[in-house]
A protein has these predicted regions:
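Mobile active-site "lid"/loop adjacent to the S-adenosyl-L-methionine
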Residues: 316-350
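A short, mixed-charge helix-start or loop-turn motif at secondary-structure junctions
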Residues: 197, 255, 338-340
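Conserved S-adenosyl-L-methionine
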Residues: 201-312, 317-328
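Short, solvent-exposed loop/helix junctions and linker helices
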Residues: 157, 304, 345-351
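Non-catalytic, mostly N-terminal accessory regions of nucleic-acid modification and defense proteins
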Residues: 1-214, 218-219, 281
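Phosphate/oxyanion-binding active-site loops and adjacent basic polyanion-contact surfaces
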Residues: 207-211, 346-353
Length: 353
């Protein structure tokens, strides 16, 4: 328990340090700050997860003083054999993708380009599994170029160095068996500043973990014989309701389906799914308007899909005046009616009649 607490404290220190770096380079409370924080944190998590798993399948790496160096010295065939032995929810990383490799290249003048290309190369290599998508089936990769958000070109390489410098102080390896109970709190801490800051309206999309847990207990009750369960949230936000439900049911017994119009929510949801060992559900995390373009269909592709559990905490007031008539043109689906567009304060437009 004390060991986990120490790791948790170090994780919080890492998040604070990454936010401080963004502040130093002029992106504190900037609209792009959350992209940097969440993606760099996720990179650290996946790097350590990969290291943890490869040492389980390779005695040579497990016994190496520096496993990253031993991994880099392996033949390509040996590395491919390791890839074949890894669970499907583990990203495939080459030696040049590892944090240790970036650390060793920090002195190079174009380190910002090296950092960005590393992130995008990881995303490209793992896009089949580690990606979400839009309602139009466009893949949303795991990572993107991050130093582009620093306006001053000359500050981009130092910014990248400052980020990598924060990632080498500890490893998540000791905490990976804690799963939800450890990382749920971390996720809540990670996004807390973006609930009100950064130009966003995250209060509309976020449900506190404690409330989500109570809702999951009420829904599932004492049911234990649960298998192949499908859970859905049509306004998923950061996915907290779905994570609590999956934890109550059992992550290995359910599949998550989600949709939300917000690009930012989708990035947060992606992080949440990965932290909670629900990588297999990433493909079902859709960014798009649930009202006019619901993505999840039945197996025959004709009707809307039905689910075992549906949870939702939608924004009960929002401006959907642009799509109101399209929604009203679907009376079978919206049989209870569609609210009229108010003359003033469209942002307070009710979502129900």
């Amino acid at each position: 328990m004390e060991e986990t607490k120490t790791i948790k404290e170090k994780t919080i220190e890492l998040i604070d340090a990454l936010k401080a770096t963004c502040q130093t380079y002029g992106m504190g409370n900037d609209g792009n700050e959350y992209k940097i924080i969440t993606q760099v944190f996720l990179y650290k998590f996946l790097n350590d997860k990969f290291g943890y798993e490869v040492k389980k399948v390779s005695t040579a790496l497990k016994n190496a003083e520096k496993w990253e160096l031993a991994y880099a010295e392996m033949s390509e065939d040996d590395r491919l054999d390791i890839f074949d032995s890894l669970p499907s929810d583990i990203p495939l990383l080459n030696p040049e993708h590892l944090i240790a490799n970036l650390w060793n290249q920090q002195a190079k003048g174009d380190f910002d380009l090296i950092f960005d290309s590393t992130m995008t190369d990881i995303a490209d290599k793992n896009i089949d599994i580690f990606s979400t998508q839009t309602a139009q089936n466009t893949k949303i990769p795991l990572f993107e170029k991050l130093t582009q958000y620093v306006t001053d070109d000359t500050a981009r390489a130092p910014f990248a160095r400052a980020l990598v410098d924060k990632l080498v102080n500890f490893s998540f390896e000791e905490a990976f068996e804690k799963h939800y109970d450890f990382f749920a709190d971390i996720f809540e801490y990670l996004i807390k500043d973006y609930n009100t800051a950064g130009g966003g309206k995250y209060a509309e999309y976020y449900t506190p973990h404690a409330i989500a847990t109570i809702m999951a207990r009420l829904l599932v009750g004492n049911a234990t014989d649960l298998h192949s369960i499908e859970c859905y949230d049509p306004s998923a936000g950061t996915g907290t309701l779905l994570m609590a439900l999956a934890h109550k049911i059992g992550e290995d017994k359910c599949t998550i389906f989600a949709q939300d119009i917000s690009q930012r929510s989708n990035k947060m949801l992606k992080l949440n799914l990965i932290l909670n060992s629900l990588v297999s559900s990433l493909d079902h995390a859709i960014q798009g308007d649930t009202l006019i373009a619901p993505y999840h269909k039945s197996d025959n592709g004709q009707e809307l899909r039905t689910f075992d559990y549906v949870v939702s905490n939608p924004p009960f007031k929002m401006d959907f005046s642009d799509t109101r008539e399209r929604i009203a043109a679907m009376p079978v689906r919206f049989w209870a009616g569609v609210p009229k567009v108010p003359a003033k304060k469209k942002e307070s437009m009710a979502i129900y009649t």
